[in-house]
A protein has these predicted regions:
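Intrinsically disordered, low-complexity regions enriched in serine/threonine
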Residues: 16-33, 38-214
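Amphipathic alpha-helical segments
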Residues: 1-18
């Protein structure tokens, strides 16, 4: 990481013991699997809609396993904070891909994932700020009903999930009708969803909506 000093391992409790000294952690390499978690926690993206001034930062997680799921996955996201037990607060999925270990395709997938990581490490934070500003000013519709209709049609969301996301955005965001406000509503909904497949579907919808303004 010498070439990318802004990116680093997040701090976690030493040996996983709650309350212990916090040390850089988030990298694991075994005989048949690996895990890498990096954050750019020193370059705030300046979210203009954040009334808490908590900051918004970039991160990514790369996983590979030859057993179990037997897949290579890469997830790029925005976040507010990472606590000592590596819970990611304000998680906002931006992009990701998953490739199963089938034939020789995994070699190409590795190359693709490393290219994505390299691009992310080198990317100017100003590009992400531009996307946020654009998403904050672009509206899905002029009314609640119009936003819900657009969300259901464009994001493959159920009417129930679309309405719940809007309610959360209305409660916490400056403009729940904006792309950015509604994305934050989806993120909060994902955090309240108990099942992993449900969280994935909501996160995927949020990612799809955010990338539509890129």
């Amino acid at each position: 990481m010498v070439q990318h000093p802004a990116w680093h391992l997040p701090l976690g409790y030493k040996d996983g013991a709650f309350g212990a000294e916090r040390v850089p952690s988030g990298a694991y390499l075994g005989d048949r699997d690996m895990f890498l978690f990096l954050v750019d926690g020193n370059r705030d993206l300046d979210d203009p809609t954040d009334r808490s001034n908590a900051g918004l930062f970039r991160g990514f997680i790369l996983r590979n396993s030859d057993v179990g799921a037997a897949a290579l996955t890469l997830d790029v996201f925005l976040f507010r904070a990472v606590c000592g037990n590596h819970i990611i607060w304000g998680f906002q999925h931006v992009a990701g891909f998953r490739r199963r270990h089938v034939g020789a395709s995994i070699q190409e997938a590795w190359t693709t994932s490393l290219d994505h990581i390299r691009a992310g490490l080198d990317a100017d934070p100003a590009l992400d700020r531009t996307v946020i500003l654009r998403a904050a000013t672009q509206e899905l519709g002029p009314t609640r009903e119009a936003v819900l209709e657009a969300a259901v049609q464009r994001l493959d969301l159920s009417q129930k999930h679309a309405a719940e996301a809007y309610t959360l955005a209305e409660q916490f965001e400056m403009n729940p009708r904006s792309v950015w406000g509604y994305v934050q509503g989806l993120t909060r909904l994902s955090q309240h969803t108990p099942w992993q497949d449900g969280r994935f579907a909501v996160d995927r919808a949020a990612s799809r909506l955010l990338t539509s303004v890129c």
